[in-house]
């Protein structure tokens, strides 16, 4: 499959590196040409920093930018990509944000936390797809199956609910870890002493009902 990536951050980088083994990354577009060039070099793609340079001869365009920038990016590329399937990677953004500018709109959402220095176990990462046209579902399923064994067709409402839960399970939990580290750092206590507790808590939460595993107050 021929794919154009818009964005050169964490999600775009991980997607590009994972997809390049089975697909062709045609272009990487970023407002920062240096960032586009850095990622494009890794996946043998063309780096561009202007929407006027977009090549319409692609099967799919993946917008992997911040949630706040999706609508603006979608509108800016619309005059140059009139026939392409355009998807975003956001969990909290409705598909209608793209549908306002593109007849063929979709979502390709990986439920995962991304850091540039860490590899992703893509085969185990749930991928959630959605499309405005039925024919594009098959295209998204094909792409998702090339990465993961866990592919789901969710509506925007379902995906937004899942994203909210993910914020509690990931972002909020990590914030609590940071607070715990600040507490022990203040008294020169080794944070690694908490590692077994953190890991056991996570293991119990994934193997049992979390509510039943609460062993003490959270206040």
Predicted features and spans:
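Hydrophobic anchor at the start of a short beta-strand
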Residues: 3, 25-26, 45, 84, ...
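Localized chelating/binding microdomains
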Residues: 1-3, 22, 96, 116-119, ...
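Internal alpha-helical scaffold of NAD(P)-dependent oxidoreductase catalytic cores
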Residues: 35, 39-42, 119-165, 169-206
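Hydrophobic Val/Ile/Leu positions in short beta-strands of Rossmann-like dinucleotide-binding domains
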Residues: 3-5, 63, 129
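NAD(P)+-binding Rossmann beta1-loop-alpha1 motif at the extreme N-terminus of oxidoreductases
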Residues: 1-50
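Rossmann-like NAD(P)(H) cofactor-binding subdomain of soluble oxidoreductases
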Residues: 33, 38-119
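C-terminal active-site/capping subdomain that shapes the small-molecule cofactor and substrate pocket
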Residues: 212-219
